[in-house]
């Protein structure tokens, strides 16, 4: 909230124009995406704690989820860095990474559905893993969105 308040103060007092205004508005939008990333991370942590703490699933069964999470985690800092540096080349790279993450998510979803059909006892835990994977995929989408704000800041009107 403090950053959003600071953005509003800058707009009210300084009345930025053109590129400066686009940057302040982008920062304001980034805050929303970072908050949503935090919400998704919280969901993942709660599900992982529940799954592992209650021995509903072995840690090795979360390997692909961990791998997807590592890719997503590797997207957040570069997305923020791209915005700070106004690096449009990084936006393209992050967009490609997100496409791969989306494909990986779909492949993992198919694999988990097959696993549930083969072992109906695993349905509850597997559905939780699916929700975790979806949260990870959403985090990747938010990271890509943060990077895409670079395009809106750098484009001329």
Set out the residue ranges of the language-model regions:
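Cytosolic, long alpha-helical scaffolding segments
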Residues: 1-157
């Amino acid at each position: 909230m403090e950053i959003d308040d600071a953005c509003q103060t800058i707009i009210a007092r300084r009345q930025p124009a053109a590129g400066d205004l686009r940057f302040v508005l982008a920062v304001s939008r980034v805050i929303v995406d970072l908050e949503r990333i935090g919400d998704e991370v919280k969901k993942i942590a709660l599900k992982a704690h529940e799954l592992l703490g209650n021995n509903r699933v072995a840690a090795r069964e979360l390997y692909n989820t961990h791998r997807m999470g590592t890719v997503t985690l590797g997207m957040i800092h570069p997305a923020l860095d791209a915005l700070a540096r106004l690096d449009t080349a990084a936006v393209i790279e992050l967009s490609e990474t997100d496409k791969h993450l989306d494909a990986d998510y779909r492949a993992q979803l198919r694999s988990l559905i097959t696993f549930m059909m083969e072992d109906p006892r695993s349905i509850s835990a597997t559905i939780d893993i699916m929700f975790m994977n979806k949260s990870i995929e959403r985090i990747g989408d938010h990271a890509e969105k943060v990077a895409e704000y670079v395009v809106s800041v750098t484009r001329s009107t």
